[in-house]
C-alpha cells in the first residue's frame, strides 16, 4: 500500500512539472496570466513565482 502511494505521488509531481514547463521555449516562457514572455526583456522577468502578480507589482 505504501509503495502505491509513493508511486502515485511521484507520477503526480512529474505531471505537474511537465504542465508547468509546457510553455517553455529555449529558456523563454510565455505567461498566459500576464500575456508576456520572460527571458527576452530583462525588465520583464514575469515568470518566476506568480508571474501575473510580479508583472502588476513591477508595473510592467
UniProtKB/Swiss-Prot annotation:
The keyword Chloroplast does not apply. It comes from the Eukaryota. The keyword Cell cycle does not apply. Disulfide bonds join 31-47, 38-51, 46-55. Keywords: Disulfide bond, Knottin, Neurotoxin, Secreted, Signal, Toxin. Residues 1-22 form the signal peptide. Expressed by the venom duct. It is found in: Secreted. Probable neurotoxin. This is Conotoxin Cal6.30. It comes from Californiconus californicus.
Amino acid at each position: 500500500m505504501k509503495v502505491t502511494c509513493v508511486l502515485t505521488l511521484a507520477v503526480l509531481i512529474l505531471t505537474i512539472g511537465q504542465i508547468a514547463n509546457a510553455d517553455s521555449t529555449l529558456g523563454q516562457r510565455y505567461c498566459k496570466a500576464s500575456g508576456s514572455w520572460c527571458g527576452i526583456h530583462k525588465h520583464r522577468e514575469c515568470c518566476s513565482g506568480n508571474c501575473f502578480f510580479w508583472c502588476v507589482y513591477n508595473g510592467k
